[in-house]
A protein has these predicted regions:
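Alpha/beta-hydrolase
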Residues: 234-385
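Alpha/beta-hydrolase active-site loop
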Residues: 154-179
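Gly/Ala-rich beta-loop-alpha elbow adjacent to hydrolase catalytic centers
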Residues: 190-195, 199
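Conserved loop-alpha-helix segment in the C-terminal half of the alpha/beta-hydrolase fold
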Residues: 375-414
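Active-site nucleophile loop of the alpha/beta-hydrolase fold
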Residues: 220-229
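N-terminal cap/lid segment of alpha/beta-hydrolase-fold proteins
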Residues: 38-90
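Catalytic active-site module of serine/aspartate enzymes centered on a nucleophile-bearing elbow/loop
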Residues: 400-445
Length: 445
């Protein structure tokens, strides 16, 4: 989540079947990737597996080396319906899901990972059941283990590196799709939160590539932006960019944001001692603290959005959540949030949202022409983030705002994370996404 709790806490060509036979062997694919000055390297699969999910669905996972650094490894996921094991159906289209920070791909399949709620209450499962070839990726920082203590490697790990890794993952996905009979068509990108900012930047970069070398044909942005309409919102991120710049330039420099580990701790305490006194939010129980962090995010960070809508008292303390099951949210916080991510990606995205700083990361925005679907939560980034698409040259832009309460109750309305977890997210968010994908489906022979 963007700068979450920062003001509250010091930042303390191979077939699927064949692939399953070579789990212990490294396979190099001749796909170069270059990020932040790193030399181009071939993609190398170092681990993979397949899991049957039921209802004819399977989950494939590939750990792929995309650079020369210790943690230059991404985890690429595929959830797809199959005719038989290792034989995907001929899908109707394909999409790559990109998660937020400090999240992971698991957030898109939270019920499956946490065991809370029905497994198919998941945007990834929902789309796969409709014969969409669903891909996803864990950014490399999401795979850094909790026991890591040396974060020098995060010093130059910024948005550009994640964009390059995503481009490599898209190329990888297309190569697998060719081998499993899906053709070589481009993919849509669906970016939630930070993933949407990666999507905008990636598409901007692709505009300088020949059309035949581009990987993306359309973009779905889920409650985030790279440009904001509201001046107060822009000023907030200008201020946060200065704070992050100071962290990066301090002696010693601070390269890591540890907010994910705080989330993990808060959720652990809520699960093991729900009625105990919270060491994280004074005056609340451990259970209340997690709900407060989710439903009253604004009161902690000063930002204009919250993660999940809640039933709030006059102090902003939620009795429960409005749209997402309490237990699902707590379990998601505890199991799908990565403990660490680089400060530099906050700095990079804050500069873009600030709008007052010249950054090369948004240089390609004005050349983007692909179709864009931008869905905002009224209690999240919402309509303010729709300004992002006005900086592009796309003539096919659709915006959808999910609003469940009157304007006067915006502080309790449908939130940022409700878009992927809410009880009625399938109707309000996922079905419109599916409809848009089908409306932009490429003709097939």
């Amino acid at each position: 989540m963007k700068t979450l709790l920062r003001l509250f806490l010091v930042r303390v060509p191979l077939g699927i079947g064949m692939l399953c036979l070579v789990l212990s062997a490294a396979l190099s694919l001749p796909v170069p990737v270059k990020a932040d000055g790193l030399a181009s390297v071939p993609l190398e699969i170092v681990d993979s597996d397949r899991t049957e999910l039921g209802d004819g669905l399977a989950h494939y996972r590939y750990d792929v080396v995309v650079g020369s650094g210790k943690y230059d490894v991404v985890r690429i996921h595929r959830i797809v319906r199959e005719d038989r094991p290792n034989k995907p159906v001929r899908t109707r289209d394909a999409v790559m899901l990109l998660h937020g920070n400090p999240g992971s791909f698991a957030g898109f399949v939270a019920p499956m990972v946490t065991g809370v709620s029905e497994m198919d209450h998941s945007i990834a499962i929902f789309l796969a059941k409709q014969d969409i070839d669903v891909w996803g990726m864990d950014f490399g920082w999401a795979l850094v283990p909790p026991e890591e203590t040396d974060f020098e490697f995060m010093g130059d790990w910024g948005l550009a590196k994640d964009v390059a890794h995503t481009e490599a993952a898209l190329t990888f996905a297309r190569s697998i799709r060719v081998d499993t009979g899906q053709g070589n068509g481009k993919l849509h990108v669906l970016g939630f939160s930070y993933g949407g900012q990666v999507g905008y930047t990636l598409l901007g970069n692709e505009t300088v590539q020949p059309r035949g070398l581009r990987n993306v044909k359309g973009m779905i942005v889920l409650d985030v932006g790279v440009k904001l309409e509201n001046e107060g919102d822009r000023e907030f991120y200008c201020a946060m960019a200065l704070i992050d710049q100071a962290s990066l330039e301090s002696d010693p420099p601070v390269y890591v944001n540890r907010i994910g580990s705080l989330f993990n701790l808060a959720a652990y305490l809520a699960s093991t001692d729900p009625d105990g006194t919270s060491p994280i939010v004074a005056g609340l129980t451990n259970w209340q603290a997690v709900l407060f962090i989710g439903a009253s995010t604004e009161r902690i960070t000063g930002q204009f959005w919250h993660m999940v809508g809640g039933y709030l008292d006059e102090y902003g303390v939620p009795s429960s959540l409005r749209f997402t099951e309490d237990q699902l949210f707590v379990a998601t916080v505890g199991t799908t949030f990565a403990p660490y991510y680089p400060v530099r990606i906050d700095f990079d995205t804050e500069q873009m949202m600030c709008g007052a700083v010249d950054t090369p990361l948004d240089d390609g925005l004005s050349q983007i022409t692909v179709p864009i679907l931008h869905i905002g939560a009224k209690g999240g980034f919402g309509p303010s983030a729709y300004a992002s698409s006005t900086f592009t040259a796309s003539r096919d832009v659709t915006t959808i705002t999910v609003q469940r309460l009157p304007d006067s109750d915006e502080a309790m309305d449908f939130g940022h994370v409700d878009t992927v977890l809410a009880r009625d997210a399938e109707t309000l968010v996922w079905q419109p996404i599916l409809d848009w994908i089908m409306a932009h489906r490429e003709n097939r022979p």
